């Protein structure tokens, strides 16, 4: 309860100091939250976490000026969303049990929390990087970076650019291909960090996908290049974190249940899940593989199929947002990428063996 009051107090301090032009700003607000968390962690006996946070707060205070330069590209709402997001993570962490049973499935909330933090760090790096991009090839680069955060949302943004200027066809087509490239790369990074053994089976498919999509994207750019403004919205916020956590939990339970059914139920479920939210599917597959609930080979095959399903979903988004004439131009590249990824995972399973 005390932490909730402190969090509210911190947010109020930040907003009021921003309006008044006071020196109390982002780093001070973050430091207040983290310092209070140090006491909570020590009280719970989490001394390692307390030491880590102590070092972190020292770095934040030491690099205060650089931090101000970093967040200078963010508006007040975006910084407020980030603060609320950090506060939410801090409130939830001490309350989470290490594991519990739900519908006969062993759920590990702390692991899900850690995955959300990992994804958030990736999103933050991409989000900040996008603010410092040069103007050259901005549509294509924003397509790639946006694909790392929210695939379907950035497709909608690209199509808005296309609707405003039909001459941007080549740029938007290249951007769509790069969005899917980024999606493959993001999901690959997440599943291999969570379950490193899957690297043996998803590494070759990723290389084949990159070798297919990047040249096609470059080909569109060589035809004609134009510039346009596009913006990536903040990926932070209480609702975004809650939605991600609930999605991972739900998909994890469904995948674990489908595995118990035997046959191809796991693969079918991964495909259906990939049509909706491939990130949650890939994270859940990695978690199941890490806990030896499924093998690395099963996780890899389901991972590739989920990504293939997500490509289909992206085509649907492209269609409904007004990109009917673009589908025929980019379908060849995407079809080849799906085929080579599936061939790649089977070759990997043959090469590295079954278990």
Model-derived regions, located:
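C-terminal ends of transmembrane helices
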Residues: 7-24, 61-74, 125-134, 155-165, ...
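Alpha-helical transmembrane segments and their membrane-interface exit regions
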Residues: 5-14, 55-66, 118-122, 208-216, ...
């Amino acid at each position: 309860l005390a932490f909730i009051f402190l969090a509210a107090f911190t947010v109020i301090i930040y907003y009021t100091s921003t309006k008044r032009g006071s020196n109390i700003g982002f780093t001070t607000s973050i430091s207040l939250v983290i310092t209070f968390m140090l006491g909570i962690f020590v009280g719970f006996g989490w001394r390692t976490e307390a030491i880590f946070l102590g070092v972190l707060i020292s770095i934040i205070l030491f690099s205060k000026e650089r931090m101000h330069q970093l967040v200078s590209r963010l508006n007040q709402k975006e910084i407020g969303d980030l603060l609320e997001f950090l506060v939410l993570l801090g409130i939830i962490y001490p309350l989470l049990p290490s594991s519990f049973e739900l519908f006969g499935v062993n759920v590990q909330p702390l692991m899900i929390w850690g995955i959300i933090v990992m994804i958030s760090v990736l999103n933050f790096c991409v989000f900040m990087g996008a603010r410092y991009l040069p103007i050259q090839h901005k549509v294509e680069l924003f397509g790639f970076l946006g694909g790392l955060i929210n695939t379907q949302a950035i497709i909608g943004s690209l199509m808005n650019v296309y609707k405003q200027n039909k001459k941007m066809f080549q740029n938007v087509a290249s951007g769509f291909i790069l969005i899917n490239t980024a999606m493959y790369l993001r999901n690959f990074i997440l599943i291999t960090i969570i379950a490193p053994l899957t690297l043996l089976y998803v590494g070759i498919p990723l290389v084949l996908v990159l070798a297919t999509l990047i040249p096609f994207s470059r080909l569109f750019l060589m035809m004609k290049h134009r510039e346009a403004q596009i913006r990536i919205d903040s990926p932070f916020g209480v609702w975004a974190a809650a939605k991600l956590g609930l999605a991972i939990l739900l998909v994890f339970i469904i995948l674990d249940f489908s595995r118990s059914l035997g046959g191809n139920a796991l693969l079918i479920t991964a495909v259906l899940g990939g049509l909706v939210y491939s990130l949650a599917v890939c994270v859940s597959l990695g978690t199941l593989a890490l806990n030896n609930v499924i093998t690395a080979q099963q996780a890899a095959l389901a991972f590739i199929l989920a990504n293939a399903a997500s490509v289909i979903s992206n085509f649907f988004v492209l269609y409904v947002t007004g990109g009917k004439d673009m589908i025929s131009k980019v379908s060849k590249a995407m079809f080849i990428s799906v085929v080579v990824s599936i061939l790649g995972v089977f070759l990997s399973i043959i090469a590295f063996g079954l278990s």
